Amino acid sequence: MAKYGSADLTISADVNDMSDYVDTVNDVMIEALLQEGTAFGDSWVEQLSTGIKRGSPVTMEGFFDDTAATGPDVTFNALGTTLAMILTWGSTKTSTFSAIVTNYGRKPMRGELTRFTVTLLPVGAVVEA
């Protein structure tokens, strides 16, 4: 069984490789939506699957870079636009989804390098291959 680390993760946003800029990714989660289905006589809460799934927001962070054509500032500082995201885990496992850029910010700190943060909201299916 192969084990993979951060050096094995590739992050692509549209055609730009963001792997050299991003150093933190929160959970890439897919969830099934549920509805409570507890009846009056039940002593335990029951959950029913609605049959609908969604991807949770993905937050990425790294060092700010304003490289004109491919850096995180030009790629992620486009609020409201949709990006084609591909995360490659190790050799061939991928998570592919379209996501709207909902938040983008720069985080300057005294005595430290400026960082960026971006939140991407998946729209439609998150395809695991």
Language-model segment annotations:
Residues 1-64, 93-119:
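Solvent-exposed edge beta-strands and adjacent loop segments
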Residues 70, 109-111, 128-129:
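Short acidic, gly/pro-rich beta-turn/loop elements at beta-sheet edges
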